[in-house]
Structures are given as C-alpha cells and as structure tokens.
Amino acid sequence: MAKLSKRQKLINEKVDSTKAYSIEEAVALLQELSKVKFSETVDAAINLGIDPRKSDQAVRGATSLPHGTGKDVRVAVFTQGANAEAAKEAGAEFVGMEDLAEQIKGGMMDFDVVIADPAAMRVVGMLGQVLGPRGLMPNPKTGTVTPDVVGAVKNAKAGQVRYRADKGGIIHGGIGKISFDANAIKENLEALISDLKKAKPASAKGIYVKRVSLSTTMGPGLTIDQSSLTA
C-alpha cells in the first residue's frame, strides 16, 4: 500500500466528504490545507441541470469577477489601425493581424486570452485548429469578438472569467487565489453563479444549479452549502 503524504493524511483527517460546507468554512479549510509555496488558484465546479448534448442547452459566457482572479492575464488582439494602438495602450501584449497569426502558427502561445474585432475574424478563422482545442477561439458570446476591443482588453485584464459547460454539464473556472480573504472568494463565486442563472436555457427543467464545489490547485474538493451564498 502506498504511503500517504503528510498533506494527504491531513486532508483525510480534516475533510468530511459527506458534508456541505458554508463558503466561509470551505475557504478557511482550503487555506489550512494549502501547504505549497505558491498561492494556489481556487477553482469552482458548478454542476448544472442541463443536457449539454442539446444545442439549445449549451451554456457559455463571461463573468467579470468583482475581485479579479489574482492572475496576470496576457492578451492577444487581432485588429488594425487606430484600434491596434488603442489595444496596446489598454495593456494588450500582442496586437496584429496576419503577422500575429503567423507567430501563432509558428508556436507562439504566450497569452491567456484572444480578442478580435469582427473584421479580423477572417484571419483568426484560419487558426481554429490551434486556438480551438485550447479554448482560446474568440466568440461573441464571451465578449471576445467585439468592435470594442479596448473594453474587452480591460475586462480581460481586470479578471473576467470565460466559462463553458463541459460534456457533463459542469462549469469549471478559477475564481481567485487561496490568499484572497473569504469574502472576496464568496463575492466572486456569487458573481459567477448569478451570471450562470441569467444564462439558464429556457428548455432546462428541474433544479438548475445542482451542486457547487470549491477546490485548490493541489487540494481536495469541498461541496458548498448553497444557502451560505446570496446569488
């Protein structure tokens, strides 16, 4: 039998897998169990009452978290002319058209978000096989295909989270760092759930937000008592 690490022993001692924790309890416990030397990301997993096989029950979008993600987001923008200069001034690391596309085809992937103005999609469309599998393809539903590229850059830099239900109907997203206080994580989670409720498909039946859990990069998953949230 494999020997358990000190951290795993602590997790086994402290975590009750049958319990639904208040958001405050969950954050305190995750912080107690975080023994690594970096500030772990706090990840939310939200099980939705949808059938993702049905096209009219696809759930995707973007949420601006009130306290950001704690992550330094690097942005690539496809645009030209005055928009290009404005995007650079707003903080975009990479701005261009065909030249930027060639860099990406050559393997340059040093960015977290890709934004495009509508006219640039003729160029971005050729990168579908590169950007698509990584979840980086711009999309109007997530606000990353827009004539307002400056606003999109600012949103991305401020900690906007893009979400999309997976094949199991689960939304995954980083909502902050373990170094955040409990209230900041709570308000970020509530903002995400609030936007998910607004995006509820009309054809979805029964309980919509079925389960909410939080985990850290290296830690356990804790079920959240939804009555401790105001979303």
From Swiss-Prot:
Keywords: Repressor, Ribonucleoprotein, Ribosomal protein, RNA-binding, rRNA-binding, Translation regulation, tRNA-binding. Coiled coil: none annotated. The keyword Cell membrane does not apply. GO terms for biological process: regulation of translation; translation. InterPro entries: Ribosom_uL1_bac-type (IPR005878), Ribosomal_uL1 (IPR002143), Ribosomal_uL1-like (IPR023674), Ribosomal_uL1/biogenesis (IPR028364), Ribosomal_uL1_3-a/b-sand (IPR016095), Ribosomal_uL1_CS (IPR023673). One of its GO terms (cellular component) is cytosolic large ribosomal subunit. It comes from the Bacteria. Gene3D superfamilies: 3.30.190.20, 3.40.50.790. GO terms for molecular function: rRNA binding; structural constituent of ribosome; tRNA binding. It holds the Pfam family Ribosomal_L1. The keyword Metal-binding does not apply. Belongs to the universal ribosomal protein uL1 family. Part of the 50S ribosomal subunit. Binds directly to 23S rRNA. The L1 stalk is quite mobile in the ribosome, and is involved in E site tRNA release. This is Large ribosomal subunit protein uL1. The gene is rplA.
